[in-house]
C-alpha cells in the first residue's frame, strides 16, 4: 500500500503505528497516547485536508528528498525537523490508517520520563526555531505548516489537563461561577480524548492504567522541571 501511495505521487507517508504488547501501565498509556495522536493529528487532519503529523517510526519519505535534506536535521529532534522541512516545501504527508506497523517499547519508568522530557523539549525547540515563519505561512496559504507551528504552542496533554484541573480547583474558592468554564473545558478535553481512543484499547489493562495517571503525571511534571538532561 505504501508503494502504491508513493506511485500516486505522495512523497511523504505515515503508517499506523500500534503497540504489539502492553505488559505494564506505562506501555498501556503510551499505546493510548499513540492512538489519540493517530485519531486527531493524523486521521483527523487528513479528513480535513491537512497534512498528517509524523510519528517517528513507520514513516516513508522520498529518498532523493531525504538525501538532499539529511544534513539539515537537528540534534534536538529529527522527526520535527523533517516535518518542518517537508511542510515548508508544501510536501503533503499522507496517512495510511490501514497500513499498520507494530512496535515494541521499553516500559521502564526512567526511560518513560526521560523520553517524555526529551519530547517536550524537542517540541518547544521546534516552536522557537519555526515561529518566525508563522506569519509568512499564514499569508502565503501554507496552512499545513502554520497548523503544525500552532500545534507546538499547545502544552502536552498531561500537563494541559493538570493546568486546567488546578485552575478549576482554585477558582472554586474564589469565584464558583468563573470556575464553571474551567470544568467545562476539562470535560470537553476529556470527552475529545475518549472519542479518539479505539475500542480495542479499552479493557482491564486500560482501567488499571487510568488509576496510575495522577502519580505518573506528577512524576512527569517534576521530571520536566527538575530532571537533569543527559549529555
Set out the residue ranges of the language-model regions:
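Nucleotide-sugar-dependent glycosyltransferase catalytic core
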Residues: 104-121, 205-208
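Membrane-embedded multi-pass helical conduit in multi-pass membrane proteins
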Residues: 151-230
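Long helical/loop segments within the catalytic core of UDP-sugar-dependent glycosyltransferases
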Residues: 3-75, 124
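Hydrophobic, membrane-facing alpha-helical anchors
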Residues: 130-142, 171-175
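Catalytic donor-sugar/metal-binding loop of nucleotide-sugar-dependent glycosyltransferases
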Residues: 83-102
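Loop-to-transmembrane boundary segments
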Residues: 138-158
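Acidic donor-binding loop at a coil-to-helix junction in glycosyltransferase catalytic cores
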Residues: 75-82
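Catalytic core of nucleotide-sugar-dependent glycosyltransferases
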Residues: 33-40, 113-134, 163, 216-227
Amino acid at each position: 500500500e505504501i508503494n502504491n501511495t508513493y506511485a500516486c505521487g505522495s512523497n511523504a507517508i505515515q503508517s499506523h503505528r500500534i503497540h504489539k504488547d502492553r505488559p505494564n501501565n506505562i506501555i498501556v498509556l503510551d499505546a493510548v497516547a499513540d492512538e489519540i495522536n493517530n485519531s486527531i493529528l493524523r486521521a483527523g487532519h487528513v479528513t480535513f485536508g491537512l497534512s498528517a503529523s509524523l510519528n517517528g517510526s513507520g514513516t516513508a519519505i522520498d529518498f532523493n528528498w531525504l538525501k538532499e535534506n539529511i544534513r539539515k536535521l537537528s540534534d534536538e529532534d529529527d522527526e520535527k525537523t523533517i516535518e518542518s522541512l517537508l511542510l515548508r516545501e508544501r510536501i503533503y504527508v499522507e496517512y495510511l490508517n490501514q497500513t499498520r506497523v507494530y512496535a515494541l517499547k521499553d516500559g521502564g519508568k526512567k526511560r518513560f520520563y526521560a523520553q517524555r522530557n526529551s519530547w517536550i523539549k524537542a517540541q518547544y525547540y521546534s516552536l522557537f526555531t519555526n515561529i518566525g515563519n508563522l506569519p509568512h505561512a499564514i499569508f502565503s496559504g501554507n496552512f499545513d505548516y502554520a497548523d503544525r507551528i500552532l500545534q507546538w504552542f499547545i502544552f502536552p496533554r498531561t500537563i494541559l489537563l493538570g493546568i486546567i484541573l488546578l485552575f478549576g480547583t482554585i477558582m472554586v474558592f474564589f469565584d464558583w461561577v468563573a470556575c464553571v468554564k474551567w470544568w467545562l473545558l476539562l470535560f470537553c478535553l476529556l470527552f475529545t480524548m475518549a472519542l479518539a481512543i479505539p475500542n480495542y484499547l479499552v479493557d482491564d489493562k486500560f482501567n488499571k492504567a487510568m488509576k496510575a495517571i495522577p502519580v505518573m503525571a506528577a512524576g512527569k511534571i517534576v521530571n520536566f522541571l527538575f530532571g537533569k538532561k543527559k549529555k
